[in-house]
């Protein structure tokens, strides 16, 4: 549907049944994937939007993550956080499976880069603590050590050196248990 006036477009869109809207968004997403297969990166954000509106959780998650990655590479840190947060919100409506928990861990780790560049804006602590919780739930020692390291840095930056040190010590123990030198080395730097 093409309308020249935004108000007419909005009225026409809102007059469609929700089921029909979802179908249209899904078809638009598929058409973009087919037509622009060679240069999909240019359309990640649009695909995330259409697949979210179509309630295609798998594709919406995929394109929200890719949009966040793209924004991070382009130093658009606030945009990156918004896309990653969208992926987290989408996952929160999905079944509580191990795969979805792993996706939640992945997204929260990806969020840590823009959060660090933005000096940990409001809500950052909750993101990191949720990542720590998910890592403990599925027994993923590597991601747990990463979140403990991030929490150590967070509290150090926020002026709570004691709590930061506690997380650093716990991180080192976890990294030592996984025998991952890449996780042990950054702890001393922070």
Give names to the regions the model predicted:
Residues 30-34, 68-69, 86-96, 129-140, ...:
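Amphipathic alpha-helical segments of tetratricopeptide repeats
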Residues 1-82, 86-94:
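Short secondary-structure boundary elements
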Residues 11, 49, 67-73, 106-120, ...:
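Tandem amphipathic alpha-helical repeat scaffolds
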Residues 13-20, 57-61, 69-81, 99, ...:
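Short coil/turn connectors between adjacent alpha-helices in alpha-solenoid helical repeat scaffolds
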Residues 85, 89-97, 102-104, 109-116, ...:
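Glycine/alanine-rich phosphate-binding loops at beta-alpha junctions
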Residues 65, 78, 82-85, 105, ...:
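Surface-exposed alpha-helical interface segments used for non-catalytic interactions
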Residues 39-44, 75-79, 99-103, 138-150, ...:
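Alpha-solenoid helical repeat architecture
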């Amino acid at each position: 549907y093409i309308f020249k006036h935004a108000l007419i477009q909005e009225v026409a869109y809102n007059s469609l049944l929700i089921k029909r809207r979802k179908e249209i968004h899904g078809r638009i997403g598929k058409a973009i994937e087919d037509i622009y297969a060679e240069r999909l990166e240019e359309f990640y954000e649009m695909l995330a939007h259409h697949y979210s509106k179509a309630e295609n959780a798998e594709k919406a998650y995929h394109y929200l993550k890719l949009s966040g990655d793209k924004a991070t590479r382009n130093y658009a840190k606030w945009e990156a956080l918004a896309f990653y947060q969208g992926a987290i919100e989408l996952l929160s409506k999905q079944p509580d499976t191990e795969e979805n928990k792993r996706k939640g861990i992945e997204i929260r780790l990806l969020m840590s880069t823009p959060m660090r560049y933005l000096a940990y804006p409001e809500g950052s602590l909750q993101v990191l603590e949720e990542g720590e919780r998910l890592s403990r739930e599925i027994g993923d020692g590597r991601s747990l050590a990463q979140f403990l390291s991030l929490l150590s840095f967070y509290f150090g930056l926020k002026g709570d050196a004691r709590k930061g040190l506690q997380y650093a010590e716990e991180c080192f123990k976890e990294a030592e248990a996984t025998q991952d030198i890449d996780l042990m080395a950054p702890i001393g730097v922070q």
